[in-house]
Amino acid sequence: METRPSFAPNLYFCDARLVGPLHAWPPLFERVAAWGFDHVLIGGLWAASRRGYPRHVADPDRPAESFATSLDATSALARLSDSAREHGLRIAVEVVVDRVAREHPLHDAHRAWYVVDERDDALIDPRTAALAHDVAHANVGSAAALDALADWWRARLGALADAGAAAFLVDAPQRMPAHWWAALLRALRQARADLPVIAGVPGREREALAQLACAGFDAAFSSLRWWDLRAPWFVEEHRLLRRVGAPIAFPDAFDGPRLAHDWRQAAPETIERAHRRALWTAAALGTGWLVPMGFERGVAVELMAREPRADAYRAALDSAPFDLSGAIAEANALRRATPALRGNGEIAQLTGADAPATVLLRGARTALEYDDEAALIAVNPDLAHPAAIAPCAALAGVPGGFTRFAPFADGRRPRMGALEPFALAAGACTLLRAQRARPVTTAPAEDRRGNRPGTRASVTAALAGERIAIERIEPVVDDGRFAVKRVIGERLAVRAAIFADGHARLAAAVQWRAADENGWHEARCAAEGNDAWRADIPLERLGRHLFRVIAWRDDWATLVDEIGKKHAAGQAVALELEEARRLAADVLTRAPEANPAALAVLREFAAALDAAPPDQRLALIGAPHVADAFAALRERAFATRDAPVFPVDVERRAARFASWYEMFPRSASDDVRRHGTFDDVVAHLPRIRDMGFDVLYFPPIHPIGTTARKGRNNSLQAAPDDVGSPYAIGSPAGGHTAVHPQLGSLDAFRRLVAAARAHDLEIALDFAVQCSPDHPWLTEHPGWFAWRPDGSLRYAENPPKRYQDIVNPDFYARDAMPALWIALRDVVLFWIDAGVRIFRVDNPHTKPLPFWAWMIADVRARHPDTVFLSEAFTRPSMMYRLAKLGFSQSYTYFTWRESKREFIDYLTELADGPAREYFRPNFFVNTPDINPRHLQQAPRTQFVIRAALAATLSGLWGMYSGFELCESDALPDSEEYRDAEKYELRARDWRRPGHIGDEIARLNRARRDNPALQTHLGIRFAHAPNDAVLVFSKATPAHDNVVVVAISLDPWHPQATDFTLDAALYRGWGIADGERLVAVDQTADHVETWHGRRHYVALDPHVRPFAIWRVAPAAGVARGARDDARDVPAQEVHER
């Protein structure tokens, strides 16, 4: 606790030798008073030593020669004090206690009080020789000398105070013992309680400051002058100085090199900027502050130097490039009006040392937490560049909760508000008033006044609250807002953290049901340790499922556990056995008759327990069948059900594992002179099947409009025989539910669907929500479209691009709600009726999200086996959101990923991040619109590499026809194919030399043979030092299928690398780390035995740029308990 108000002076320091005679002082006092100072601190008041050091006093009764007076020093001080008082000022005097000039009368009269330094090195060192010859130091090693000096200085300071000295500055007080100061100042204040004494200790180390903490000083000088305005030491020094006395800051040195000297090489405006910054920083951060004479005009002449340079000082004043008198007056006025700038309060630095600007908060009291108001100081340490202030960084956890700010206003009540981001000019310093925001109190007003009628209601609610905590349920998507995705036949592993107060045993279960069921199924959870619980639930039906987690206190298990522990410790358990008997009896009286078998077991147990002697009851209570009976009767104390019900979408395998082949059926004739038909496609089915594909995907097969039809290579003028883009859907022949007449009839399409199924292929159709200007809907439903003010249609645009052959319906046009939505849903249902269950949706990110959520849910409610592929090459957030809304799978950025690091990062995001629960990537190597630059002019081996990457990294991959022929001719500086099939018919020689159909077939065969390759999950990247080789492993959750894949990323040169298998693989098998493995090459029918975790692979792109091994423990390898952890995270593993 502070015993008196902080000493917070506004000091102006004067070197007496530079001011001049006594008659020169009144004009100085007048100016200083006008600037708002309340004290003038005088240094060099007394006659200096022969060598001229002003702090080495030669005669305490003689003033400095510069006063030009016959008065003694005390009388001169009295005259100065009287003159200062006339201007509202008080005089403070600097005194030096620990040393005197050797010619000082006190030294002559009392040699035992002092010691002189006669060491040779002190005399030889030119930096200290003059000082050593000039001075005598107090004999601090002598108690008698210290007592005598204390008496002398007590009388001396008293006499100076009588002469008008209102405060004293003690130079280097740390040179005298702290206890000596405490006794001296205590005695001095017995006579003059209001006489402040300042410790002149700037730049002193922590130990010196700590020693003076109890010495009794009223104030102490800080080291602000030398702070870089960044480092945290200033705040730490302030904390220590507050224990010594109120910190006094100064913008410039009152002895030693001046600020103007530091910046002497800078431009005049920079020097002024430095002075202004120093001024406001000192005024804001000191309890008191001191301005050395000449600072206001940027004078560089040193004060308190051995040789006074009065003429140079006056010349510098006369030629000063700036005058800060007005700013000084403003600072003094602000300090007088602002308690937070005058208190000996806490200063907190709110920004780090490397922040662009430094922000500090200071209060007036002991701690900011207890201050009513504070001041925010923001300063730019850079004199050349502005700095931005980010409140979010500066105010995080702000001490005292000060979050309302306003500029300091003269006499007006400021309007406080939140701190907005702002910029500080170069070298600027800004001060803001700070207040706390009113804390949030939610208790009713009558409760806050002490009458607490609301207490009963709140405590009643608390009593009904959930005693058991259920947290961190997984897997969930966005806290259950969207469904987790799984495929039919999987078991969903549900995990949760479940815990409660005390030591009672808990039990938990996962309840689940299909969305068309009313009752809940239940699976008991197993405890995995550390409050983790798990249950696996079967997913045996397609469609939406729901699950929830429940928990309860298992009183029977708790009692049995307690009895067992006490018995094992040799404690009596008779009372606990009686509790068990009563618990069983209570359950029998409450239990319903719905479970007669459990009731029978419990009745038999109760009877046996009554009849058994005490030594046999223990065995009866611990019987497992008794615990099972209690569980079956669902005696669940404090049962807690987690509020949310979490959805799960169960889809068929094609949603997670499929190999897609895209072709234009109109090119199926293999003759550019004849439009292909569905019947022509049938002839291609064996070729596509033999490459191992199972999904055959067509771009739109509907009638194509003729208005603004695009010509070859996307030209704006179409020739009469140009076929146009199939995405310009609709003509007089029909719209989205019609078949292009040249492809055949709807019956022909149905025949194709049946033929594809006979070849183990499934047809996927493109669902493109767009129309040509000739679409029947424009005449039948013009209100479904957007029209321009001139009556023209609003064509599809992606400014500045315009697609005159396409118009988009307006989902929120007045006439379109809900008719358009229903019509589009009916399009999907129409093609489902025609035998299609897979739809690739064109650009879904350009259509409203609520439509997709409704449409997919509505279709799946009728046909849960429907699969939707999202073709949304857009921002990740939108791609992920579409997946959450129900799209089964999505195109991805794989098409543009090329480097090893990119593959690792992207697969880690997809397989180990939140997206793993709902986003299934379909890795297309190319599309009719995307001819990737890494394939253009690339060798055959690059196509094999991209196919291997897509086929092994994801369970879903696809290619557009022509990829197997290594087609890559592109338009200049474009990813568009030259002579793109999107605008014309194409004929190909499917068996021409150089095709990669055989390699694709081997890849797809490896995918079918290895369940680990049928998903993107379970992947772990191995450490391989060669960045041109990607090595990874994939494992099923049960580790009953593990593959290791190595792929060269260099299509030109052979590459080789070591790689290290992850230890998690061995844990998954339940074998020792590095045990023998059998590795079966999946494309070369070669078997190897691997020893240890490190292995080697060499890949020649001209032979085979990839290797796929199925690995398993060798015969005879001992197996233990396997690590049944969740799917292996997709991260790169480094050998330790």
UniProtKB/Swiss-Prot annotation:
Membrane spanning residue stretches? none
Which residues does the UniProt site feature Transition state stabilizer point to? D929
- Keyword match Transferase: yes
Q: What is this protein called?
A: Alpha-1,4-glucan:maltose-1-phosphate maltosyltransferase
* Organism encoding this protein: Burkholderia pseudomallei (strain K96243)
InterPro entries (alphabetical)? GlgE, GLGE_C, GlgE_dom_N/S, Glyco_hydro_13_cat_dom, Glyco_hydro_b, Glycoside_hydrolase_SF, Ig-like_fold
Q: Which SMART domains match?
A: Aamy
For this UniProt entry, the molecular function terms from Gene Ontology, in alphabetical order, are:
hexosyltransferase activity; hydrolase activity, hydrolyzing O-glycosyl compounds
Give binding positions for alpha-maltose 1-phosphate: K710, Q770, D805, N843, K982, Y983
Reactions the enzyme catalyzes: alpha-maltose 1-phosphate + [(1->4)-alpha-D-glucosyl](n) = [(1->4)-alpha-D-glucosyl](n+2) + phosphate
An example of a Pfam family matching this protein is GLGE_C
Q: What is its EC number?
A: 2.4.99.16
Q: Which UniProt keywords apply?
A: Carbohydrate metabolism, Glycosyltransferase, Transferase
Q: What does this protein do?
A: Maltosyltransferase that uses maltose 1-phosphate (M1P) as the sugar donor to elongate linear or branched alpha-(1->4)-glucans. Is involved in a branched alpha-glucan biosynthetic pathway from trehalose, together with TreS, Mak and GlgB.
The segments labelled Unknown in the record are: 1-439
Disulfide bond sites: none
